Swiss-Prot record:
A single GO molecular function term of this UniProt record: transmembrane transporter activity
Protein species of origin: Rattus norvegicus
Keywords for this protein: Cell membrane, Glycoprotein, Ion transport, Membrane, Mitochondrion, Nucleus, Transmembrane, Transmembrane helix, Transport
Gene of this entry: Slc22a3
Protein name: Solute carrier family 22 member 3
Principal place of residence: membrane
Amino acid sequence: MPTFDQALRKAGEFGRFQRRVFLLLCLTGVTFAFLFVGVVFLGSQPDYYWCRGPRATALAERCAWSPEEEWNLTTPELHVPAERRGQGHCHRYLLEDTNTSSELSCDPLAAFPNRSAPLVPCSGDWRYVETHSTIVSQFDLVCGNAWMLDLTQAILNLGFLAGAFTLGYAADRYGRLIVYLISCFGVGITGVVVAFAPNFSVFVIFRFLQGVFGKGAWMTCFVIVTEIVGSKQRRIVGIVIQMFFTLGIIILPGIAYFTPSWQGIQLAISLPSFLFLLYYWVVPESPRWLITRKQGEKALQILRRVAKCNGKHLSSNYSEITVTDEEVSNPSCLDLVRTPQMRKCTLILMFAWFTSAVVYQGLVMRLGLIGGNLYMDFFISGLVELPGALLILLTIERLGRRLPFAASNIVAGVSCLVTAFLPEGIPWLRTTVATLGRLGITMAFEIVYLVNSELYPTTLRNFGVSLCSGLCDFGGIIAPFLLFRLAAIWLELPLIIFGILASVCGGLVMLLPETKGIALPETVEDVEKLGSSQLHQCGRKKKTQVSTSNV
């Protein structure tokens, strides 16, 4: 009985049918990027903020103060460098105790010796000066509530983590396409609710749900794309689909610039997902999944459609097709750590996923804290990511996996450390070094997808990659707290943490086995032999392309 891969070769492994489906599903990567990094614009800090007391409110109305005058006359001098974004006060002058005669004056500080009034903490009635409204001004996420901005991104990543396990399981049980469509619908609906959330609690709850559905849509589209093409094309399509994620990062600042409110940005992030529901009529269910669920006839119908569109013919000999037993096995968590080599690979890969997420998200969100043109800086940082995919394609088949993987992490780590200590008087050098760091961590993020799938045997590949990549979402939960809370102490402190993490990761990945030119391991025993020189010598004669289909 022929296997699915044999039938796919007859129908065409990457013909017109697959290219059309591939292009359509790649657009999901664009919208997922909007969701993944949208907090930079949704939660951008206002230019200035302060709070009003009862007396200041009356004076502002009677004296017709401008916002700048109110800022200067009712709040203490702020000793913050002018180039820092988001200047604000967490205290105000206590003006309520002034005498009656001073109430007639439009200079409330004149009643105090040395024009120095007592200070009290702000308790509400916040005022903002900003060019675009954000969730910070909508929900007063400043001063004592500043940590709640960190929470919004952490909750989104918690949704990603929940979606990876719940919808990942659902996609294996009920089908890739149905879960993809439900996820796209969920992203749209929850996104609209987020845009019109009446309070912060509703905002956070539905942002979590949008994260669940967003991860489900991204994960299942990735799987459908890689399961419908031949094994030789999986490595390339796995990298190219991530380039569409980068395309989303490049497009997002343009949307944010021309959209005056955070609600508009949120709708722009969410509404395109409804268009993906039209894929019901053009994107098929994964035939490979259908076979594992003993629906071979439906899989054959799809393969005949593929063959017809590709200008090929699937002969009557392919009346039944099957998959290998490994593709329907039931793995266990213990299998990932039971043996020495598997244990080493699992722990290092988990750390690599965690580091990639923390450093990547940290560098992206940091753009919202530093000075300069946020929109242009974000756009340029997205452009920087594009060469990363090209460098990966050029190096991994020549230099192997370990060296580019380690080098990209070390470049990212060293760049972060150097940027932290460069003087601000040479911005061009800081920008250049920071750009190298962004390029390095982007490459590391993309390579870990590939290496993870190569190092696990067929019996554990789906489960193992899903479990390890869960550390990516956990890193995303940690990243905003790590960035914003440490930046409040010293703006460059997060860069030092990022630099240490990435540098350590670069050293650890050199301990992984090299898999260039090595056949994909089929069993745990194959993985245990990867470190032996005998297998490496055999591997030079036997080359197999790598599947990244289940990230």
